[in-house]
């Protein structure tokens, strides 16, 4: 049954409140909640949100950015609430009715910067390529984006595949964002010889300094987690100077994920390295308590709610270590 916009907004508020309870709002999320709520309401499409991500920086002022994601199953032919869609109504309707590739769409809002009027829009590719890449970028209204994306994708090294792609029209140069998942064999080869990663980064067009790569990649590759890489392709077709390197945790029950944050756990070990690099303060410990996996009654049905860290991103820019962020995925599902 399709929920009203008020019902969806109330569910979002519950997901956020559970994560931010017991003082965690001040430590992790700051004062962004009202603007994030507004961004969520602008995003409402389809028959229900699949999940949201709270993108939480691990140093500096407490704040967060918001991602609102929709699986294909959530997008119907009459998909939009009045006034919602953040200007991407035609893109979402085309995707729901005409495009058979990809596994869903998502908005991304720079809430922490106070900027929600021009959100990014991404398509989750994940081994199901779009049939009409050109139409996606045309409806995303960024000139030349399809050409930039294709040129980058044609240079992907062995063992890489596009996980998601999209555009950030509100950022300087309206970059095309491409996230690449590295298969386990290639990832382990990087762990054995970091020069292979340096070679592959150069071959895909990343030309900026790699001075901080040994520290950042070394920390990630010493962990057991998967590896993703994020790139921005700029207006002139060049790959931008910022590189994202992410440890992908996968999805596990909250109790199991918490154990990874305990002393000796794989995430705790990784975060110890990140702390040594100066990219996080003690707030990362609060992420352990922000996660949950619970059920609750909601009228005549039962909801399962969860909030779990799905990956950690480390960024470098012009060769220098820049920052670290946790991405907390949260969702509510009806049971039975």
Stretches found by the model and what they are:
Residues 1-110:
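An N-terminal, globular interaction/scaffold subdomain
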Residues 20-27, 145-148, 206-209:
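Residue-level signal for secondary-structure boundary elements
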Residues 30-59, 100-108, 112-114, 156-166, ...:
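Short, compositionally biased low-complexity segments enriched in polar/charged residues
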Residues 56-61, 111-115, 167-174, 235-239, ...:
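Short, low-complexity cationic-aromatic patches
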Residues 64-72, 118-127, 172-188, 242-252, ...:
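Extracellular/lumenal glycan-associated surfaces
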Residues 71-97, 131-144, 185-207, 255-275, ...:
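Extended intrinsically disordered, low-complexity coil regions enriched in Ser, Thr, Gly, Ala
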Residues 85-197:
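Internal, hydrophobic cores of structured domains that mediate oligomerization or house catalytic pockets
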Residues 192-336:
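C-terminal structured domains
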